[in-house]
From Swiss-Prot:
Site (Transition state stabilizer): 16, 23
EC numbers, comma separated: 2.7.7.60
InterPro entries for the chain: IspD, IspD/TarI, IspD/TarI_cytidylyltransf_bact, ISPD_synthase_CS, Nucleotide-diphossugar_trans
Site (Positions MEP for the nucleophilic attack): 155, 211
Reaction catalysis annotation: 2-C-methyl-D-erythritol 4-phosphate + CTP + H(+) = 4-CDP-2-C-methyl-D-erythritol + diphosphate
Its biological purpose: Catalyzes the formation of 4-diphosphocytidyl-2-C-methyl-D-erythritol from CTP and 2-C-methyl-D-erythritol 4-phosphate (MEP).
Name of the protein this chain belongs to: 2-C-methyl-D-erythritol 4-phosphate cytidylyltransferase
Length: 231
């Protein structure tokens, strides 16, 4: 039976949050943000194990205050993140063992749904690469250097990509290695495989699947969590 591994990337410092603590460890309704993220993969029966990518100086804290405290035993490997997200993902990929599909997910994106996880695995098996996201609601403009609007993009052609981004393991590992060798810098993992001619299937995510990045995101996160609990 093929195995599926979630790589949860939580090594970023989150400087936009303006706190002394990493954003993944900020409490949301009494529990760390990272707990909610890991718990979704822990409880999903399609996920066999989790590789967690952390900053070196936060590994001990996370083990004691998140993994042991909440009994998150699907986390089989903890690896040290790199200077960039790209380096952190490669570290996570190198720790994966015997998995056909990997799901790369932001540690600060705690409202992932089972349906999104299942669809990501399904489409990655079919097409090699998949990513969830949502249609853009606002009008998007291209801004010129002088501050004036240069162009208006067609909203119906735009898609705000989220995580997890899901791949056949060999495909994403080989593309990341090539990108590192070729000095190609990317902002997400779908861009890595696209750089080498591979198509990515985009499927429906959720507007609740937000990434908590700034202080303004915390009240929204609390509201989403409250709604989830009452459903």
């Amino acid at each position: 039976m093929s195995k599926n591994c979630a790589i949860v990337v939580a090594a970023g410092k989150g400087t936009r949050m303006n706190t002394d603590i990493n954003k993944q460890f900020i409490n949301l309704k009494g529990n760390p943000i990272l707990y909610y993220t890991l718990k979704k993969f822990q409880d999903n029966t399609s996920i066999d194990n989790i590789v967690l990518v952390l900053s070196k100086d936060e590994i001990g804290y996370c083990v004691e205050n998140v993994l042991k405290k909440y009994h998150l035993d699907k986390v089989t490997h903890i690896v040290e993140g790199g200077k960039t997200r790209q380096e952190s993902v490669i570290s996570g990929l190198n720790a994966v063992k015997d998995s056909e599909i990997v799901l790369i997910h932001d540690g600060a994106r705690p409202f992932i749904e089972d349906r999104i996880i299942e669809d990501g695995i399904k489409y990655a098996k079919l097409y090699g690469a998949s990513a969830c996201g949502v249609k853009v609601k606002d009008t998007i403009k291209v801004i010129a250097e002088d501050g004036f609007s240069k162009d208006t993009l067609k909203r119906e052609e735009l898609f705000s990509v989220q995580t997890p981004q899901c791949f056949k393991y060999d495909l994403i590992l080989n593309c990341h290695k090539k990108a590192l060798k070729d000095n190609i810098e990317v902002t997400d993992d779908t861009s890595v495989v696209e750089s080498y001619g591979h198509r990515v299937y985009l499927y429906e995510g959720s507007y609740n699947n937000i990434k908590i990045t700034t202080p303004e995101d915390l009240p929204m996160g609390e509201s989403i969590l409250e709604n989830i609990k009452t459903c």
